[in-house]
């Protein structure tokens, strides 16, 4: 029986060959796609591997950047301080629009071919995500420190990362970037942006997306918990009380 991985690899290879045959006909053309259209989160979901692939015109000495961004969410960064030998949360910053997943892939270190100003213009990198704190006012230095702290936290959880050398280009036309989605990703639409860079300038750009969706019993529980949170909470309390009563009754009998 042919494995799923082998089928995906075969399909991707054939698609790459087809794209490569068309690429020379178009100047500064960039075409990208993903090996999967949807990632299903089931009860036994343990992450997923997929492949971003495509073709670009005359990129022998050029660079490719792939930005893989998940749905935005509200997230808090906390600063701990040691008081009387105990670490406690002293300060916190709540972010309105932090991406739940942010992985960058590039042919080499982005700082080798894009200056900080160019990265800012292209909105590349976690420092240029336009993160908005709910705190009314933060000095620039303080804001940067909080952004660095948020990045460290998300990197530790495998949700943000920068893969220098994560994109390979073959014969100046075909490119590919393996992508690994961890088990703790959120459902939603994941946007992919691919940039073709030459001498620090954007030559071409393409976008695609993939949906991550819960399936099966886990999807039903997730929808109930989010759409009917009050009833879900009451049911959880009632279930806990009933389970406790049954356990107590069983112990009394023994």
Which residues does each predicted region cover?
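Membrane-proximal low-complexity regions enriched in glycine and acidic/polar residues
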Residues: 88-182
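Juxtamembrane interface at the cytosolic side of transmembrane helices
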Residues: 240-254
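Short, aromatic-rich amphipathic segments at membrane interfaces
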Residues: 180, 203-233
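Short edge beta-strand/loop segments characteristic of extracellular beta-sandwich folds
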Residues: 51-57, 178-180
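Sec/Tat signal peptide C-region and signal peptidase I cleavage site
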Residues: 22-27
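N-terminal edge beta-strand
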Residues: 28-45
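Extended, hydrophilic extramembrane loops/domains of integral membrane proteins
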Residues: 184-214
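Bacterial N-terminal signal peptides
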Residues: 9-21
